[in-house]
């Protein structure tokens, strides 16, 4: 049972890292992702940036 959970955990972590790498944002780079242009260009968290653009004009 321990081996099964160990393998499942390893597979899940591997898949998460793989997905992150496909998108260019592995888990250890999530802080960079939070500040990335793509992340900040969508959703409520982008409103501050929208305000900055508005007042820059």
Curated annotation (Swiss-Prot):
Arranged from A to Z, the UniProt key words for this protein are: Secreted, Signal
Where does the signal peptide begin and end? 1-24
- Tissue expression notes: Prismatic layer of shell (at protein level).
Any one GO CC term of this protein is: extracellular region
Signal as UniProt keyword: yes
Where is this gene product found? Secreted
* Protein name from the UniProt record: Uncharacterized shell protein 5
- What is the protein's species of origin? Margaritifera margaritifera (Freshwater pearl mussel)
């Amino acid at each position: 049972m321990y081996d099964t959970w160990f393998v499942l955990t390893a597979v899940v972590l591997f898949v998460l890292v793989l997905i992150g790498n496909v998108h260019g944002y592995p888990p250890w780079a999530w802080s960079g992702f939070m500040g990335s242009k793509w992340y900040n260009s969508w959703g409520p968290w982008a409103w501050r940036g929208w305000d900055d653009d508005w007042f820059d004009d």
